């Protein structure tokens, strides 16, 4: 789950990480009121969407008068902001953050992620913060410093101080940087975040260390113990189909292809998509029905896939371990009839009650294309999607 910048800053504030004063706004009138409350002479009008690259996309503007606040708020609110993270379709801006201006002397970068190799937390920091951190990572990776933090110990004072000095924080400001780094780490750990990023973390002219931006991603599997994080959820920023899928406990992610995939198990789902691509096809979605699929869940899964106007074929790939193949067959038959399926359907089933499931499909009278192996299934669905 992702949240907005201003929400991330609320979290940072709770963990004693210095952030600028700011007020969210949902209208031009609220933006003007926020600017008046903050006082001038400089404000920053920032689009709030779940994507980076807002500055380059025209979603962040510095205003030096109330008239400029009004102009920028009017221009940004309601615009479709296209960045390198939104894709060409962009995201509509429904809210703003009006923030006090800052005296920026130096922009730094710091982030925390889970390092799967070490099974610990990786702290990454750079002296080259700001809008072009992707360029730094691509062309001068030596400027990015990485520290592996043992979660049983946490980020120690000496480690934080060392990282701060490596990214160019002057000695007089190192204690402030330590506070910011340790606060960010604590926020990351205690909220079950999968990513916590400050870009930029700035040094001001008078030596202060301030988080000028904040980005958090959270482990969705841990949200049950964080109602305060769930309260930040903005459904306008999420894919409508993914929201609908979550109501039926389906793991669904929209993709750009034309072949629908219905699979049980995330690993098998990814392998299925890889195999489709291997034979020249493009998956339209990731869809994991899990180990407890019912007729209702399978029907809803079909409905979700068929909402895609570009869908040309569907592949159902099931391994019957916990999930019995006859139950899936029953669901596929019922779903096909319920939605009046009009695209080719390829089904491959292996495992518990496999023969019974296959017989049910064969006797259903539906034009289902059977396959025995994953390779055969992928080849058949790619051909069907191409009209062959």
From Swiss-Prot:
Alphabetic keyword roster: ATP-binding, Ligase, Magnesium, Metal-binding, Nucleotide-binding, Tricarboxylic acid cycle
Catalytic activity: succinate + ATP + CoA = succinyl-CoA + ADP + phosphate; GTP + succinate + CoA = succinyl-CoA + GDP + phosphate
Stretches assigned to the ATP-grasp domain: 9-244
List of residues binding ATP: 46, 53-55, 99, 102, 107
Name recorded for this polypeptide: Succinate--CoA ligase [ADP-forming] subunit beta
SUPFAM superfamilies cross-referenced by the UniProt entry: Glutathione synthetase ATP-binding domain-like, Succinyl-CoA synthetase domains
Annotated source species: Ralstonia nicotianae (strain ATCC BAA-1114 / GMI1000) (Ralstonia solanacearum)
Record: residues binding Mg(2+): 199, 213
GO MF annotations, alphabetized: ATP binding; magnesium ion binding; succinate-CoA ligase (ADP-forming) activity; succinate-CoA ligase (GDP-forming) activity
Entry binding sites for substrate: 264, 321-323
Cellular compartments per GO CC: cytosol; succinate-CoA ligase complex
Gene name, Swiss-Prot/TrEMBL: sucC
Pathway(s) the chain acts in: Carbohydrate metabolism; tricarboxylic acid cycle; succinate from succinyl-CoA (ligase route): step 1/1
Subunit structure: Heterotetramer of two alpha and two beta subunits.
InterPro entries assigned: ATP-grasp, ATP-grasp_succ-CoA_synth-type, ATP_grasp_subdomain_1, Succ-CoA_synthase_bsu_CS, SUCC_ACL_C, Succ_CoA_ligase-like_bsu, Succinyl-CoA_synth-like
Cofactor(s), by name: Mg(2+)
């Amino acid at each position: 789950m992702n949240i907005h910048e201003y929400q991330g800053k609320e979290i940072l504030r709770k963990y004693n990480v210095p952030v600028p004063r700011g007020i969210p706004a949902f209208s031009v009138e609220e933006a003007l009121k926020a600017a008046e409350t903050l006082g001038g002479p400089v404000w920053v009008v920032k689009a709030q969407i779940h994507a980076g690259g807002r500055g380059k996309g025209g979603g962040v503007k510095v205003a030096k008068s109330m008239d400029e606040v009004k102009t920028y708020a009017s221009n940004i609110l309601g615009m479709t902001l296209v960045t390198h993270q939104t894709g060409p379709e962009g995201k509509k801006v429904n809210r703003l953050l009006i923030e006090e201006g800052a005296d920026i002397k130096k922009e730094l970068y710091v982030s925390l992620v889970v390092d799967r190799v070490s099974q610990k937390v990786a702290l990454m920091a750079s002296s080259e913060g700001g809008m072009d951190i992707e360029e730094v990572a691509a062309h001068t990776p030596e400027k990015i410093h990485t520290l592996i933090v043992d979660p049983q110990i946490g980020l120690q004072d000496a480690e934080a101080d060392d990282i701060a000095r490596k990214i160019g924080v002057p000695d007089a400001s190192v204690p402030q940087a330590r506070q910011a780094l340790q606060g960010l780490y604590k926020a990351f750990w205690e909220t079950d975040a999968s990513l916590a990023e400050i870009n930029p973390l700035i040094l001001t002219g008078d030596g202060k260390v301030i988080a000028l931006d904040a980005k958090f991603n959270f482990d969705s599997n841990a949200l049950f113990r964080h109602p305060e994080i769930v309260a930040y959820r903005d459904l306008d920023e999420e894919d409508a189909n993914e929201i609908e899928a979550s109501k039926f406990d389906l793991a669904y992610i929209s993709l750009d292809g034309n072949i629908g995939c219905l699979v049980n198990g995330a690993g098998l789902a990814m392998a299925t998509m890889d195999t489709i691509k291997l034979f020249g096809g493009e998956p339209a979605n990731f869809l994991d029905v899990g180990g407890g699929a019912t007729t209702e869940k399978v029907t809803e899964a079909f409905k979700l896939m068929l909402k895609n106007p570009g869908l040309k074929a569907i592949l159902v790939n099931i391994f019957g371990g916990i999930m019995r193949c006859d139950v899936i067959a029953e669901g596929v038959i019922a779903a096909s009839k319920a939605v009046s399926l009009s695209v080719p359907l390829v089904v491959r089933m292996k495992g518990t009650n496999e023969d019974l499931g296959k017989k049910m499909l064969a006797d259903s009278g539906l034009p289902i294309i059977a396959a025995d192996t994953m390779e055969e299934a992928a080849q058949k669905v790619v051909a069907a999607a191409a009209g062959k």
